[in-house]
Amino acid sequence: MESSLLDVLFLSEKRKNLLLLLLDGPKNIEEIKSTLDVRSSPIMTQIKILMKHDLIVESNRLYKLSSIGEILVPKMKTILETFNVLDKNHDYWINQDMTSI
């Protein structure tokens, strides 16, 4: 069964971390492995998935966000940050009137 784009973006910590890393610009595999503290085989599996879904591209041994990735990943980052705020302060937010938001 084919994964949805939503699944590809959010269901793997490795993929999320890689996409967020590539927001800072193109990286080679050694930079990716070092920054994310991962081995080649597991991260290459995730890279292939992201490339298959046209979220990243490779050129001259550098991986970078594709045009689609450049649109989606900043929005993904914002959503993740929002989830993090709401999750950390759940008791506070559950009792607030947020209808004006």
Question: Over which residues does each language-model region extend?
Answer:
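Short, Lys/Arg-enriched N-terminal segment that forms or immediately precedes the first helix
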Residues: 1-8
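Short helix-coil-helix linker/hinge
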Residues: 8-15, 69
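Short capping segments at the starts of secondary-structure elements
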Residues: 13, 24-28
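A short acidic, leucine-rich amphipathic alpha-helix
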Residues: 31-35
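Short, hydrophobic-biased segments on the C-terminal half of alpha helices
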Residues: 47-48
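Glycine-centered, phosphate/nucleic-acid-interacting loop/turn motifs that mediate DNA/RNA or nucleotide
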Residues: 53-54
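Basic, amphipathic "hinge/linker" alpha-helix immediately C-terminal to the N-terminal HTH DNA-binding motif
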Residues: 58-79
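Amphipathic alpha-helical dimerization/coiled-coil segments
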Residues: 77-101
